[in-house]
Amino acid sequence: MSPRLHFTAERPAYKLRLNLALGKIERLISSMEEEKQEKSSARKRADEIKEFQCKNLIAVIENPSNIKNIGTVVRNVNALGVEKVYVVDSRKSLPDDWQDMRETRSLSKTSVSAIKWSFVKRFDSTTECIEHLEKNNFVSFVTSPHIKGQKNASLDEVDFTENHKLAVWFGNESQGISGTAVEHSQMCISIPMFGMIESFNLGTTSGIVLYEVTKQRREYQRKYRRRDKRGLKKNA
């Protein structure tokens, strides 16, 4: 009798383990299906916005003191269709690897997950970043109040389509842009202000400036895309 009693006692436990295993499998399958749908939706969105992306446009953040502000700028960059973000990070607050950046919680949270869909590259110094940009034929504009001896212009006076490859720099929250970045820039851009307060924070500045830059370059791209299409029709 004892073996039979032992068997019947084990049977409910066996069923419980089986049900738990089946539950895990069902949850795994459900999770995989959700991930598949999310990827499909992301691919669809990527296809929809592809023609609106501003190629050869980079936003450069120079030595931001708060990592959360990087996330805010990345969010602006992604929403406005800027191609890449470069971060001069002499404090080494960011990981070198892009994949590791995407998994950095503070960046993911403040960028509202935009870091997952944005290309971000870090540099140890301003000089290293400038050398990389110049090697790849990028022209640099810096955002800064009027600087004596430099070419200065108001945001609404600048043609941001004159340079095929353009890098727009944003300085440190308290100290602003560095002298090294200014010296290697083609122009200093300022935002017109009409109040008692004459400054914006990094997130606001990047949003205002990049909106104007991307608006101009997107219209330029659209114009020449239409021209190319007309040319193709004539040659057909």
Tell what function each PLM region has.
Residues 11-54:
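Extended, non-globular alpha-helical segments
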